[in-house]
Amino acid sequence: MSSPKWTKEQLEVIESRECNLLVAAAAGSGKTAVLVERIIQMITSRENPIDIDKLLVVTFTNAAASEMRERIGDAIGKALDENPENKHLQNQLVLLNKSSITTIHSFCLDVIKSNFHRINLDPNFRIGDQTECAILKQEAIEEVFEDLYEERDEGFLNLVESYAERGGDKEVQDIILGIYSFAMASPEPKKWLIDSAERFNIDENFDFSQSIWARAILDTVKIEINGLCLNMERALKEVESIEELETFAEKLSVEYKKIADISQACNKSWDEAYKKMASMSFENYVKGVKRISKDAPSYIKESKEKAKTIRDKTKKSLESIVSATFNKDNDSIREEIKYLYNIVKPISSVVLRFEEEYSNKKREKGIIDFNDIEHFALNILTDVDEKGNIVPSDIAVGYRNKFYEIFIDEYQDSNLVQEVLLKAVANTETPNRFMVGDVKQSIYRFRQAKPELFLQKYNNYNDKKGSSHRKIMLYKNFRSREEVVDAVNYIFENIMNENIGEIEYTEKERLNLGANFNVDTDEKSIIGGATEIHLIQKDNKLDDDIINDKDDRINNKENEIEEEEKLDNIQLEARMVGNIIKDLMKVNEDGKIQKVYDKGIDGYRPVEFRDIVILLRATSAWAPVFADELMNMDIPTYADVGVGYFDTIEIKTILSLLQIIDNPMQDIPLISVLKSPIFGFTPEDLIDIRVQSKDKIFYEVLKSTAEYDGFTDSQNENESEFIPSEECINKSKDFLIKLKEFKEKSMYMSTDEFIWYLYTRTGYYAYVGALPGGSQRQANLKVLFERAKQFEETSLKGIFNFVNFIEKLKKSSSDMGSAKTLGENANVVRIMSIHKSKGLEFPVVICSAMGKNFNTQDFKKSILYHHNLGYGPQFVDYERRISFPSIAKEALKSKINIENLSEEMRVLYVAFTRAKEKLIITGSTRNIQDSIKRWSNGIESLDTISQYEILKGKNFLDWIMPCVLRHRDLSNLLEEVGLDAVFNVEHNSKWYGKLWNKNDILVEKKSDEEKESIEEILEKIDVNNPDSDYYGEIEEKLNYIYPYEFSTRKPATISVTEIKKIQNNYEEELINTIFEQKVILKKPLFIQNEEEREKISGTERGTIVHLVMEVLDLKNVSSVNDIKSQIRGFVSKGIITEKQASIVNPYKIYKFFASNIGKRMLNAEIINREKSIYAQVNMKDIYIYEKLINNDDKKLYDNESVMLRGIVDAYFEEDNQIVLVDYKTDFVNEENINQIIEKYKKQLDLYADIIETLTGKSVKEKCIYLFGVDEAVCY
């Protein structure tokens, strides 16, 4: 194989020496190959060969380190093939295994292990399991809080009063834990915590205009004001050349000048901007403006209306800026910040105290966590001089002398701690740091990555040869086709800039085509071509003629709607993507299958499912739905979701089994295990056991069942006379024997050994392997086994501690995600997050969910925090019950918002640049007409997308669509929604766009040729007269009548409501209907019209009222306001929705509790609400029994029974007897009360009979409470 042909820039990177070199390597530019070649040339140089162990190579992942080590090993091997006697090369192969090609954490661990004595660390330390550390954190925070409560610490109590939610301090604990994790990404976390608090410790001379908060706010306001200026320019252009609108234009011009003055003031200082904002006023547009004649041309009216609309929106936006950030003078701000000092100082104190407690707990257990790894290494490698500056320690100097050069891969993802660490071991006299990365691909800010580190060097280093601090840019893309490169450049030239994106996407940064795809002889069959955009709307209004101006509604509510993205909307887009994939895979018009280029064969082959990847910004909610929909369309799919492990049935079962082995006195896990395939108890078995006694826990009743030999006269009155079946008794005995065996084994086996013993002894591991998805299920069980092995390495031991360990793990950290069983060569469409795709490439990339709004949940936190700006707390005066975002919080929100948008832009860049041959973009929007109108605003007059529009973007489509709608290729999208096509940009990128109507993809219709009626099939059957020796026998069998035919129609269980229907209407057709299994097909939400979606049925209304009556706190129903408050609480906790709450009348509920029956219920000691009941009932007890069976056959059914099920609304004990209450929400008037009673009487009578049987107490009274007339009817 020939040697690579390096570009000029790549050769400069490979050959430059003795400098700090920053390599800005764009996506697909071959940075890894260049980095490896540089190392190879260093160690194989004839003039000055370097030993491989003299190089420190820091990679981002272990996989990258392994790949690099392997590549270097291969290169050394090839060099030895050419020169087998070379001792230096032979030595390099030996040194390679102990070379420092590693991750930053591995390097830090080596430093710690070699110098543990410098930080008084036990040499036998181990790295704590992530979940074990999470548990220790929780224990530490709880203990710190308990101590502070006992000490009555005033600052702490003030903090809790300010930010604790009603009924607990969990939110405050989360604040402390969040700030601790954030602070640990600082080289000096204690200093950061103290400085962040002390920034609020100001005096009377404080000048807000000189603060970092003011500068942060102004950075955002500048963008906003400049955007408003551009809007006013657009408005002026609409009217300035129309004579009839001269006065109107003059007024617009005055306002434009005022806003331009504000823009200039923002560039000067906060005070200047504040003055201009305060003096800003808008013109009266009625006074002094000529009325337009009715006969005036329509274009004049349209121009005026368009200009006025732009102006009104500008006015509203400016007023919003003033009210949010320019509504306080310096004195007010000073008092606000001084007040907040009493909040933020305790925050830092509590975080520091938590850090100390957590550290003590880790030391007690002899463990360190990942934060410790970096900070302990930092403590070893640095000292602090007399001026407080960080300087390298003597140990760091030793490393400086050891390493000839330090290589840092993916430098754009370094954090501040890593920067200080590697700077400490780098040479200063002869610069020797090689840093390679791409700031446009920095997407780990949520892990405290600091792209600013890369940008600082990018802006300060020069590209001159011989410079000690040099940068070289690699922007030739060797991955993607021209169409992909052009599309990426077109989008990012328009949207990425220094303010949002943190780098200007200029000619230097744009991708340059470098890939070579050998052209196939049949170009029509090659996959590729124009970049595609597919949009689908959610509300099916594509054909509306009128485009309503709903920008404000969309901007205000879209975020809220996206937070609870409806399943149906995700399904819609998934189905659309499925259709796109099928189009890619099908034979084209010329009978050809589309092909992709395969480097392995240096040629083209048919596209396969494995060539396609679907990239999502976040996978948790979307990926499972996409996977299900695609598989339903016969598209093999794998979604790497990363959650759901603890929800799998096999893991739930084994964890329940472990729980009851430790403690069988737990009903829920016990019943879960009993009805699992391990023991095979049926619902009837469980009922047989439960009805033996209502008072005992299930395990005690189970033991009694196993010992059953007939109850004696000594049975207590609460025990049932139901006799368990022999099979049930035997199952119970077998269970207890095995449980005892398991308990004994667990006493002397390690946890992991015991779990594997359970797998094999019960046969459960083999059982799940035979189920659908068996290999995945077995892999999940293996993960639990591996988790148990890790647990055994901790100081905790035993089943009890392991169960607690898992429970705390579920509460304290994210779900682990199911085990991965997919091979890299499996022929499936992959669904993955954009983050996981980084560093990968695929022939076809489908970027989906581009219409999903950016996550802004962090802004809802009580306290924001930032490395440079410190704290941004919510202002809370709990005594005066005042709460609002402080000016500091507004500053942090502005800064973090820009940083987050920059991160999102880089995420989008990573997604697009994964594509080798075909890029497809998909998204959904609530109304395509409204959205396209909004996206196309101003495209005819602006050369580029304004930073203001980028700042206001809510999702990726808000950035992509304003760019592409300027392009000639997508004129069809504008025309399809009734807008004029405007072409403002000449660009060689190619685009294809399609608007999908959801009705087009709901059902895949068969073609007419595929349809064949049943009648046509029957006509083909040759029906001859029967002529067979077996005719008589066959006829006899076919005419046989089963004597127990009624039993075949009898259900296993029947509800009281169904019996009520039978008894009220005993026509056989109704009876047969009730005794048949019913399947209710509810119309999916996404094909319901708006009226159907909004409608709440009478049944649903009743269900909601019953739910509220079930969960109400009966100690707090003494007033209508009490009940209203509780209902609001149910909404906030997610028990009911706002819409559901709106149909509950709290006054009606209050009247119930104020009634005689309500007061009696409140006074009762024992109250049961929404109680599920089950009972075996003889069919003869159902009055209509006589109508069902012929008289001659009645004796066949003497013992025929059915399991009766129902839910009793409420019953309570009074004078050792039962009072039964049933709520009814039916529409009732005074005239039909008796009809209602007759309608429900039989139902209550059945409930009463069952309750008497189950409780052993008589029902003295049965009451129906009619909410319609606020009246109870008792008998």
UniProtKB/Swiss-Prot annotation:
UniProt domain UvrD-like helicase ATP-binding: residue ranges: 4-481
SUPFAM superfamilies on file: P-loop containing nucleoside triphosphate hydrolases (SSF52540), Restriction endonuclease-like (SSF52980)
EC number: 3.1.-.-, 5.6.2.4
Domain UvrD-like helicase C-terminal stretches: 531-839
GO biological process: double-strand break repair via homologous recombination
Entry binding sites for ATP: 25-32
A GO term, aspect molecular function: ATP hydrolysis activity
Keywords, in A-Z order: ATP-binding, DNA damage, DNA repair, DNA-binding, Exonuclease, Helicase, Hydrolase, Isomerase, Nuclease, Nucleotide-binding
InterPro entries, per database record: AddA, DNA_helicase_UvrD-like_C, DNA_helicase_UvrD/REP, P-loop_NTPase, PDDEXK-like_dom_sf, PDDEXK_AddAB-type, Restrct_endonuc-II-like, UvrD-like_ATP-bd
GO CC term (a single one): DNA helicase complex
Cofactor(s) demanded: Mg(2+)
KW ATP-binding (keyword) present: yes
Reaction catalysed by this enzyme: Couples ATP hydrolysis with the unwinding of duplex DNA by translocating in the 3'-5' direction; ATP + H2O = ADP + phosphate + H(+)
Domain of life (superkingdom): Bacteria
Disulfide cysteine pairs (residue numbers): none
Sequence similarity: Belongs to the helicase family. AddA subfamily.
Known role: The heterodimer acts as both an ATP-dependent DNA helicase and an ATP-dependent, dual-direction single-stranded exonuclease. Recognizes the chi site generating a DNA molecule suitable for the initiation of homologous recombination. The AddA nuclease domain is required for chi fragment generation; this subunit has the helicase and 3' -> 5' nuclease activities.
Record note on quaternary structure: Heterodimer of AddA and AddB/RexB.
Protein name: ATP-dependent helicase/nuclease subunit A
Organism: Clostridioides difficile (strain 630)
